[in-house]
Structure formats: structure tokens, C-alpha cells
């Protein structure tokens, strides 16, 4: 069983990369792309102090309307609106198959969804990590390159954040996600490595920094610029996609059209949407999204925070609404999904008595890296009244979901077993 302390499942090379970048940044040796280093220091200072959760900003009546800044409709039976974001209701996934339909896929925006015409779109690859000058790729040119498809989940690093407070009584900052800030799709596109090689990436390249076309982010009066986050060149040349299709259709605007990054198993912020340019650098790069944001701060972590977050953690969710009602003395089929950024899911256990007894669930899918598995189990409740359902996954690395997750002030990487309330009548 896990100790409950968040640990990275990243390979040694990923971990050493992150820690090296952290030391370089702290000593002023890494270039902060697009923001003054003093402002980055302010972000780190702010991140070390917990702030209240940002609650859901809409009643069901409001949620039925379109959210400003989001293109697709957000009916309340499918989504819960949380600030400028939309969380998928897990109960809406019960009969959808392995892949999450685009109309049920969660939306995480830092600003408003830009609507970009693919015919006018150009991807510019530039920087001193190239052997030559900048290289442009049109949408048609990108689609003409060898294509690959990959099934992968995209999950916000803060998915499950609300349970730090509701289950563990701890204060954290950020959007109060439950477990619906995740979706799995079949992505089609071109390998980022293919584009970088055609652009002339040099052997001296160190970092690759994709940047989105959404509006600049302003936080507490500081302009952080457009969303961007560097990847180590080794990762950029590995399994990363520049995706232009989602579940066999062109990307919808809210999910990155015309082209987005897919970084399998990594935290959602690495999967930059609406990519407009990619900087290839011969020196380390940093941005607000891997210094003051998307790191672990709080008791047990260095003052400057943990290494930047990379791989996602292990979670399970029931395909049920909170407080779902069940008839006593009847057989019910409980369904859910489990996933891990570290290794494929090996097994799932379910408890219907608050954790006293556990039994194995039936896995419905072949477990694969970077995807989730569906599972089910039968339940015949005997006693009426309130109850709690629990699901606990174990992945092939041997890691299981713990009873609690070590606190961090921004509420990232919650991996503890979630208590799902139900009522038996």
C-alpha cells in the first residue's frame, strides 16, 4: 500500500530533469520565457500559502446555459460548472463506452476558448535549439505528415482537489473539482518528434516549449502571458502528439482546435491546447506553469516547492451521482473507472460497507498505459439508510490508492480512496 505521500512515477531521467531545472531556476540559471523572474518568485511565495477552494459557480439552472468562454453547451445532467471550467458528471459516463464523447469531455480553460480557423492557422517552430531559422507548418502540411493514433486520458492536476477539504479537513486553493476533470479519447495526429526533426532540431536542444493561442492570463495584476509549459527534449521526442482529431472527428474548439498537444500520462497542463508556436531552446526554460504553479508546496516540501509535476497519479471513480439511491434486497450493478499515470491498472477492489470488507471488481477492458479501465461488481444492499461506497485501484507497479493523500497547498495529485455517499431505501 502507498504511504499516502505523493510520489512521482516518472522515470529517473524525468525526475532528474525536473530537479535540475528547479535548481537552475532557484539560482537564476534558467531562462523564464515571457515573464520577469521577480514575478515568478511572487508566484512561488503565493503558492506556498493555502487559499480557499473556488466553489462551483452555478446552480443547475445556470449550468443549463452556455458558460461564457466555453463554446459547447453544458447541460446540467452532463456537467457541473466550476468557475470558468466544466466538470464531467461521472454518472453521465455510465453507458458511453471506453472513450469519452466530446460533448461530455470536461473543459479546463485558463481564459476563454479561442475559435481558430484551421485554414488561417500556422504552427511556427523556432528557437536557438534549431540548426536553422524558424519553420512554419500549415494545417494541411501537418495533416500530410505520417499520422498516428493513441488512446489516452487527459486529466487536470487538480482533479479530486475538493476531497482534501471534504475528506481530510485541509485547506487548499483552486477549483473544487471532484473526480470529473478527466476524459479519455482516441487522438490522431503527428508525432511532435516528426515535426521537430523536420524543423531541424539540433543535438544541442534542451527544452521544447509549446505555447497556446488563448488569451494572455492575468493573475492578481500580473500578466503571465499565454499558457505554455516546457518539456524536456527527451520527452518531446518520445510519445507526444500534435493532435488534430478526437474520436475520429476534427478537434472541437473547447478541446484545442485546430491542433493541441497530447502528452500521455502527464498532468493536464502539459497538454497545451490551441498550439500556435513551439520554441526549441538550447538552454533551460521555465514558465509560471512549472514554477509557482503545478508544483507541490506545503509541509514536507522545500520552500521553493517540489519538482514540477509530470506524471499523473492513481484514481478510481464510481459512475454514480453523489447520494445515489438504491433499493434494498435487490441486485444492483455498480460500475466505475480507474486510471494511473504511472502504470496500467492491475486490479480494482470495491467496498460497500465503508471499508471493512473489500472484494475484487471485474475489469471490462484490457489495461493499457495512459488509458483507464472500466469495471463493475454486483451489490445487494441489506440495510436501509445512508451508506458509503469505496473503490481502490492497484497498478502494475504495485502502487495502490492510499487512505489519505499528503497535503499540499494547491491541492494537486489527490490519490486517496474517495468516499462515495449513497442511500439505501
Please name every model-derived segment.
Residues 54-66:
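C-terminal region of N-terminal signal peptides and the immediate post-cleavage residues
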Residues 1-35, 62:
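N-terminal secretory signal peptides
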Residues 64-425:
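Structured, non-membrane catalytic/scaffold regions adjacent to prosthetic-group chemistry
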Residues 49-53:
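Hydrophobic core
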Residues 28-48, 261:
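N-terminal secretory signal peptides and thylakoid transit peptides that target proteins
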Amino acid at each position: 500500500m502507498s504511504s499516502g505521500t505523493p510520489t512521482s512515477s516518472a522515470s529517473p531521467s524525468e525526475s532528474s530533469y525536473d530537479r535540475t531545472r528547479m535548481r537552475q531556476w532557484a539560482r537564476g540559471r534558467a531562462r523564464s520565457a515571457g515573464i520577469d523572474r521577480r514575478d515568478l518568485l511572487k508566484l512561488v511565495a503565493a503558492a506556498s500559502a493555502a487559499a480557499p477552494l473556488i466553489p462551483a459557480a452555478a446552480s443547475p439552472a445556470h449550468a443549463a446555459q452556455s458558460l461564457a468562454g466555453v463554446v459547447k453547451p453544458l447541460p446540467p445532467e452532463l456537467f457541473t460548472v466550476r468557475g470558468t471550467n466544466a466538470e464531467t458528471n461521472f454518472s453521465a459516463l455510465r453507458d458511453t463506452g471506453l472513450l469519452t464523447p466530446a460533448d461530455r469531455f470536461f473543459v479546463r480553460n485558463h481564459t476563454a476558448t479561442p475559435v481558430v480557423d484551421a485554414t488561417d492557422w500556422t504552427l511556427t517552430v523556432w528557437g536557438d535549439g534549431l540548426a536553422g531559422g524558424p519553420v512554419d507548418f500549415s494545417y494541411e502540411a501537418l495533416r500530410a505528415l505520417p499520422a498516428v493514433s493513441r488512446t489516452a486520458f487527459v486529466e487536470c492536476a487538480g482533479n479530486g482537489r475538493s476531497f482534501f477539504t471534504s475528506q481530510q479537513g485541509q485547506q487548499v486553493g483552486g477549483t473544487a473539482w471532484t473526480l470529473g476533470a478527466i476524459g479519455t479519447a482516441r487522438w490522431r495526429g503527428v508525432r511532435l518528434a516528426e515535426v521537430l526533426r523536420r524543423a531541424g532540431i539540433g543535438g544541442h536542444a534542451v527544452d521544447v516549449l509549446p505555447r497556446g493561442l488563448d488569451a494572455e492570463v492575468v493573475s492578481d495584476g500580473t500578466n503571465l502571458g499565454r499558457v505554455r509549459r516546457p518539456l524536456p527534449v527527451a520527452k518531446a521526442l518520445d510519445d507526444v502528439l500534435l493532435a488534430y482529431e478526437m474520436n475520429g472527428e476534427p478537434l472541437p474548439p473547447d478541446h484545442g482546435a485546430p491542433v493541441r498537444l497530447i502528452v500521455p500520462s502527464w498532468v493536464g497542463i502539459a497538454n497545451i491546447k490551441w498550439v500556435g508556436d513551439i520554441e526549441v531552446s538550447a538552454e533551460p526554460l521555465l514558465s509560471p506553469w512549472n514554477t509557482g504553479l503545478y508544483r507541490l508546496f506545503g509541509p514536507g516540501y522545500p520552500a521553493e516547492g517540489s519538482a514540477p509535476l509530470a506524471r499523473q497519479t492513481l484514481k478510481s471513480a464510481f459512475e454514480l451521482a453523489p447520494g445515489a439511491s438504491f433499493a434494498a434486497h435487490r441486485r444492483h450493478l455498480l460500475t466505475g473507472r480507474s486510471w494511473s499515470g504511472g502504470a496500467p491498472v492491475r486490479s480494482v477492489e470495491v467496498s460497500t460497507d465503508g471499508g471493512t470488507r473489500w472484494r475484487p471488481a471485474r475489469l471490462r477492458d484490457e489495461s493499457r498505459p495512459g488509458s483507464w479501465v472500466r469495471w463493475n461488481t454486483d451489490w445487494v444492499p441489506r440495510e436501509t439508510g445512508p451508506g458509503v461506497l469505496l473503490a481502490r485501484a492497484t497498478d502494475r507497479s504495485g502502487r495502490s490508492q492510499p487512505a489519505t493523500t499528503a497535503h499540499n497547498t494547491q491541492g494537486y495529485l489527490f490519490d486517496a480512496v474517495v468516499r462515495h455517499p449513497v442511500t439505501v431505501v
